[in-house]
Amino acid sequence: MTKPIVFSGAQPSGELTIGNYMGALRQWVNMQDDYHCIYCIVDQHAITVRQDPQQLRKATLDTLALYLACGIDPQKSTIFVQSHVPEHAQLGWALNCYTYFGELSRMTQFKDKSARYAENINAGLFDYPVLMAADILLYQTNQVPVGEDQKQHLELSRDIAQRFNAIYGDIFKVPEPFIPKSGARVMSLLEPTKKMSKSDDNRNNVIGLLEDPKSVVKKIKRAVTDSDEPPVVRYDLKEKAGVSNLLDILSAVTGKTIPELEQHFEGKMYGHLKGEVAEAVSGMLIDLQERYHRFRNDEAFLNQVMKDGAEKASARASQTLKAVYEAIGFVAKP
């Protein structure tokens, strides 16, 4: 029986955070035995906002080394860089012609990013969800792990696939969202009602995977809790968002359940909780960074992983693009 195909990707813009790791990357690693996993570094999406060319090259290799350090195995998964497989852009253009202006106008992420990058509201930013649809549909993907911020884009990908199939027959698999059994939703350290984001301008909200562990300890010790007297370490997302966030992080790193942690911290101060979170997270990062530097310093190996990954991805992508071009009525290249 063939394994279901899973596609996911991350932009090489901005350093990945413990939120990316606990909420996504760790799930990706765990899926490798049961799914045919295709993981992409989406550098073409990254240029919808201005990038420094040297920094983009560096960030792409950094992201690849981080994927590997987190446990993504090129023997089990297809790992590649988006711009190395031209079929993504080619299918993206074709799908543009089956996507309506009004649909793209309704995308909330476009509205958010337009406000944030008001000086550079480019067509690529508007059209981003169509390229994302191409990324997914190229590989006849069965399931896509998505966070809240990308659910709307996956819905659009499904709509485009169904619209195209209604005209031309079953060319595309219609992808389903993959909802992991468990995946920590890591919140901002100082504003625990909003998600930790690698693009947050206030770096005290964020813990980067490549950050100095000493700086991480300081940030966690400054994290928001609450002013209850006496302090009570209890999981309550509504009333105690900061404490709940720290418990979620500690649970994700140690594998202990929330009830076990609540019992452990009964009668203890918030300082005890912060101390244990800081110790657990910094210990995890020291191990991860050691693996990261080993991969990052071996560019020959990274180049081989990218080359092999692009070849594997292209073999699958070219079949889908050929079927699409044939369905549309393009003359085959002699």
Swiss-Prot record:
> Which residues does the record give as L-tryptophan binding sites?
135
Span-the-membrane segments of this chain are none
Q: Does the keyword DNA repair feature in the UniProt annotation?
A: no
Which superkingdom, per the lineage?
Bacteria
- For this protein, what reaction is catalysed? tRNA(Trp) + L-tryptophan + ATP = L-tryptophyl-tRNA(Trp) + AMP + diphosphate + H(+)
Q: Which UniProt keywords apply?
A: Aminoacyl-tRNA synthetase, ATP-binding, Cytoplasm, Ligase, Nucleotide-binding, Protein biosynthesis
Against InterPro entries, the record matches this protein to: aa-tRNA-synth_I_CS, aa-tRNA-synth_Ic, Rossmann-like_a/b/a_fold, Trp-tRNA-ligase, Trp-tRNA-ligase_bac-type, Trp-tRNA_synthetase
Write the Enzyme Commission number(s) for this entry. 6.1.1.2
Q: What is its main location?
A: cytoplasm
Q: Where in the cell is it found?
A: Cytoplasm
EC top class named in words? ligase
Q: Where is this motif: 'HIGH' region?
A: 12-20
Q: Where is this motif: 'KMSKS' region?
A: 195-199
The terms under GO molecular function for this entry are: ATP binding; tryptophan-tRNA ligase activity
Residues given in the record as ATP binding sites = 11-13, 19-20, 147-149, 186, 195-199
Q: Which family does it belong to?
A: Belongs to the class-I aminoacyl-tRNA synthetase family.
Q: What is this protein called?
A: Tryptophan--tRNA ligase
